[in-house]
A protein has these predicted regions:
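N-terminal alpha/beta PP-like core and its mobile active-site loop of ThDP/TPP-dependent enzymes
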Residues: 1-325, 361, 441, 448-451
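A general structural motif
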Residues: 47, 107, 111-112, 180-192, ...
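Thiamine diphosphate
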Residues: 104, 108-113, 259, 301-302, ...
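Short glycine/proline- and acidic residue-enriched helix-loop micro-motifs
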Residues: 124-131, 176, 336-349, 490-492
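Phosphate/pyrophosphate-binding active-site segments
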Residues: 136, 172, 287-375, 496-529
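Active-site flanking residues adjacent to catalytic metal/cofactor-binding acidic residues
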Residues: 268, 294, 373, 428-429, ...
Length: 529
């Protein structure tokens, strides 16, 4: 007879889970009892925050929930930052944790790893937090924590299993999976949206992360409407090198002008949040004349004044609109998009343009790569203006929750989800030091990741912000390690280059020939502050 812990692993496998990230501990041993026989791959990070970020990167690339196994108390607290990032970016993630015995909960007796209320803490970032208290709970609790991955706006969920429950015999009936329904689109609302768009003279599409898997249909709709497509950070790549594409932040004045001049705006799968639409913290959002908004989350639809809110999946809505709209609508979309691109690129200034050129050099050296970023200067520049050549292949932690240390472990998760695709991680020397130990995980798993370290000797973005605010610069110059020595200690091939044109591409191409994980240090000049 199996234990409840073993049964949980088996039921995760039945739900399509094929990889978990975790560091075993005495409070999760029962989960590991069934893991070897399950066929699920286990990846051991060097810190539980890394487990969460790996699960995030895995989920973004695979489209399946990333799963982390963590111990009671510190294991879960270490994972909360990654859960916060996943919550901000609507990434499906399940964190399974231990917890002390049922009879001890809430009594504060000082047990190992004890917290006053672990689920209450998890709920600050998790969409759902549940506890399995008996064998009969297991299947319905799994249904509940998986529901958001299938039926609404995804995010992190949490399931805890007390020590005594995990080891108890599993005697429940064979589980049946309950699949939550995706909200059905309203045919009447689709018809209304099609009519508004058909009458438009200057339509525009705002594309968010909800369209990542619908690139072909989105391009068809944009071409039919003659509508420029402004892409948020999580939608980059869906309109690569397309005349209607505007791969620039809607926080830029040039893009805001384009939006304001559009008589109908169709927002697809975007939360219209300030980390995309007000990056400069002006306290204002782009001016919109008439807004049609499609979102899978009813709560999101209530947050902005919308002429026509449509509850449903963005990809399904695109298909429905393509079917409902006959003929071409506007003829000037490509000209409007081209002007916005030119003006936006001019607006970001010479320093940011140079960083964008470096990103284009990386893209040209390794076409079709998945590019994962930490909060680093090239990533900030790319979030302002960068066109990637792979849908869903540009993502980072510089927006939303904005957690440093994301890039290295998230790239590992991405590489595990797409083992035949090159993965490039871009991290600053400051952010990289949050998660350098995870390099050994990439080495151990033999993953084809090139880690680019943008070394400007400190937190240059913060130092600049301090100067702009009239504050003396303090605490922004942590001494970076010798990255050549770091690479050698991890057994990683190492290259060093500077920012002169061609240098990064040459190092990247050499790294691709070498195969496996590698480290490239880009010696950037610190900005004068």
């Amino acid at each position: 007879m199996s234990s409840i812990g073993e049964a949980l692993v088996a039921q995760l496998s039945d739900r399509g889970v094929d990889c978990v990230f975790g560091i075993p501990g005495v409070h999760t041993i029962e989960l590991y009892r069934g893991l070897a026989a399950s066929g699920i791959r286990h990846v051991t990070p060097r810190h539980e925050q890394g487990a969460g970020f790996m699960a995030d990167g895995y989920a973004r690339v695979s489209g399946k929930p990333g799963v982390a196994f963590v111990i009671t108390g510190p294991g879960l607290t270490n994972t909360l930052t990654a859960m916060g990032q996943a919550r901000a970016d609507s990434v499906p993630m399940l964190v399974v944790s231990g917890v002390n015995t049922l009879t001890s909960l809430g009594k504060r007796m000082g047990h190992l790893h004890e917290l006053p209320d672990q689920r209450a803490m998890a709920r600050t970032v998790a969409l759902i937090s549940e506890r399995v208290e008996s064998a009969d709970d297991l299947a319905p609790m799994l249904d509940h924590v998986f529901d958001p991955f299938q039926s609404g706006r995804p995010g992190p969920t949490h399931l805890e299993i007390p020590l005594d429950v995990a080891g108890a015999p599993y005697t429940a009936q064979a589980p049946t999976q309950s699949i939550a329904a995706v909200p059905a689109l309203s045919a009447e609302q689709i018809s209304q949206a099609a009519a508004l768009l058909a009458q438009s003279k200057t339509p525009l599409i705002l594309a968010g992360g909800g369209v990542r898997k619908a690139g072909d249909a989105l391009r068809a709709l944009a071409e039919k409407l003659g509508a420029p497509v402004v892409q948020t950070v999580n939608a980059r790549g869906v309109m690569f090198d397309h005349p209607l594409g505007v791969p620039a932040s809607p926080s830029l004045q040039a893009v805001r002008a384009l939006i304001a001049q559009s008589d109908v705006v169709l927002a697809l799968g975007t939360e219209l949040g300030p980390t995309d639409y007000d990056m400069y913290a002006s306290g204002t959002m782009p001016e919109i004349q008439r807004l049609i908004r499609v979102d899978i989350c009813a709560e999101q639809l209530s947050r902005h004044a919308t002429e026509l809110p449509i509850l449903g999946d963005a990809a399904s809505a695109i298909d429905a609109l393509n079917a409902a709209i006959d003929g071409d609508v506007a003829a000037n979309g490509a000209d409007r998009a081209a002007k916005a691109r030119r003006d936006a690129f001019d607006e970001i200034g010479p320093e940011m343009r140079a960083l964008c050129d470096t990103l284009a050099e990386v893209r040209g050296a390794v076409p079709g790569a998945i590019m994962v970023g930490d909060s680093a200067q090239p990533i900030y520049a790319g979030n302002l203006y960068y066109d990637h050549d792979r849908p869903g292949g540009w993502f980072n932690a510089a927006t939303g929750f904005g957690a440093l240390g994301y890039g290295i472990p998230a790239a590992i998760g991405a590489a595990l989800a797409a083992p035949d695709t090159p993965v490039i991680c871009i991290a600053g020397d400051g952010g990289a030091q949050f998660s350098l130990p995870e390099l050994m995980c990439a080495v151990q798993e033999k993953l084809p990741i090139c880690f680019l370290i943008w070394n400007n000797h400190g937190y240059q973005e913060i130092a600049t912000s301090m100067v702009d605010a009239g504050v003396s610069v303090v605490g922004c110059d942590p001494t970076p390690p010798d990255f050549a020595a770091v690479a050698q200690s991890c057994g990683l091939p190492f290259w060093r280059c500077d920012t002169r044109p061609g240098g990064v591409a040459e190092a990247l191409q050499a790294a691709m020939v070498a195969g496996g994980p590698s480290l490239i240090e880009i010696q950037a000049q610190p900005s004068p502050v």
